[in-house]
Amino acid sequence: MSRVYKIKNLEEARNFLYSIEEPLILTNDDSSIKYYGMLVIDYMFKTLRREFPEKVLALTVNVGQDHAALFTAIKLGYKNIVYIGASAEAKRLLSDLYNNPITYKV
């Protein structure tokens, strides 16, 4: 089973990735979508994946209950998305995403 690391900020994540040997899955901190926004989270993920390609197995975006972040994550091509809201429309979008995946490499 792969280890998961929650990104709090870019500098801390870089320091952590420099210090480890084994590959892992990156995700964002639960509340970071509120104070950073989806585009900043995307920038951090892509930067870390580019800088540490051998250490980043996968990316999982945690959007919480944020609909705008969910739609942005889907538009950016993310497939591993954690959404805890109750929106039927959002759940339908996620269901469609998993049944008809978008081909886009993040």
Curated annotation (Swiss-Prot):
Upper classification of the organism: Bacteria, Pseudomonadati, Pseudomonadota, Alphaproteobacteria, Rickettsiales
Protein's organism: Rickettsia prowazekii (strain Madrid E)
The protein's name: Uncharacterized protein RP547
Origin: domain of life: Bacteria
